[in-house]
Amino acid sequence: MADEKNKRWQELADVKRELAQRDWFYGTSGNLSIKVSDDPITFLVTASGKDKRKETDEDFVLVNAAGNPVDPDVPLRPSAETQLHTYVYERTNAGCCLHVHTIDNNVISELYGDKGEIRFKGNEIIKALGYWEEDAEVSLPIIENPAHIPHLAAQFAKHLTEESESGAVLIRNHGITVWGKTASEAKRVLEAYEFLFSYYLKLTLYQKQLVT
C-alpha cells in the first residue's frame, strides 16, 4: 500500500507541476486526485487551501470512499469538492480526476450555460478525446454551480456512467472536471478541452472582426 501510494503521489505531483506551469491554479483554485486502491477505494486528493504552484510534502491527503482522511490524525483537510471525486471513483472506471478554473472555461460555461452543453466539431484535437470518426462531434455538458457542494455533486453525478473511463463536465462560472483511466489520460482530456475553449473563443472573435 505504501509503495502504491508513493507511486501515485509522484504521478499526481507531476501532473500538478505541469498544470501549475500553465498557470491554471488561480488563487489556490482547483483540485486533483488519483486512485490508490480499488478495494477498498482510497485516493489521494489535493489538500484544501494550498498554493498548487508550490510543491510540499503536504500537497495531497489520502482519503477513503467517503472522502474522509484515512489517517484521522492528519492535520490536513481534503479539498472542499472531494465529494465530486468520490463519485468519479465509485461510478466510473477512472483512475484520475482533475478540476481547474481557467478564464476560457469560465467564459465558455457562461456563454453556453443556458443551453446546458457546448458542441465541438471539425477540429483535429477532438481525436485526443477518443473520437476518431471524420467530422466527429463532441458534446460537453454544462451544469449549474450551487454553493452547497452536495447539490453540486448530485448534479455532477448524473453525467457519470459505470462503463466510462474518461469524460468531462463543465460547471458554470466555476471550472471543468475531467477524469481518465490514468493521470496522463486525464491530463490529455483536460488539455484537449482547454485547447477547444481557447480556439473557439478566438475563432468567434476573429470571425466577427472579419465581418465588420
Curated annotation (Swiss-Prot):
Its EC number is 4.2.1.109. Zn(2+) binds at H99, H101. GO terms for biological process: L-methionine salvage from methylthioadenosine. One of its GO terms (molecular function) is zinc ion binding. It catalyses: 5-(methylsulfanyl)-D-ribulose 1-phosphate = 5-methylsulfanyl-2,3-dioxopentyl phosphate + H2O. Gene3D superfamilies: Class II aldolase/adducin N-terminal domain. It comes from the Bacteria. GO terms for cellular component: cytoplasm. Transmembrane segments: none annotated. Pathway: Amino-acid biosynthesis; L-methionine biosynthesis via salvage pathway; L-methionine from S-methyl-5-thio-alpha-D-ribose 1-phosphate: step 2/6. Its cofactor is Zn(2+). InterPro entries: Aldolase_II/adducin_N, Aldolase_II/adducin_N_sf, MethylthioRu-1-P_deHdtase_MtnB. Binds 1 zinc ion per subunit. The keyword Zinc applies. SMART domains: Aldolase_II (SM01007). Keywords: Amino-acid biosynthesis, Lyase, Metal-binding, Methionine biosynthesis, Zinc. Homotetramer. PANTHER family: METHYLTHIORIBULOSE-1-PHOSPHATE DEHYDRATASE (PTHR10640:SF7). Catalyzes the dehydration of methylthioribulose-1-phosphate (MTRu-1-P) into 2,3-diketo-5-methylthiopentyl-1-phosphate (DK-MTP-1-P). Belongs to the aldolase class II family. MtnB subfamily. NCBIfam families: PRK06754.1, salvage_mtnB. This is Methylthioribulose-1-phosphate dehydratase.
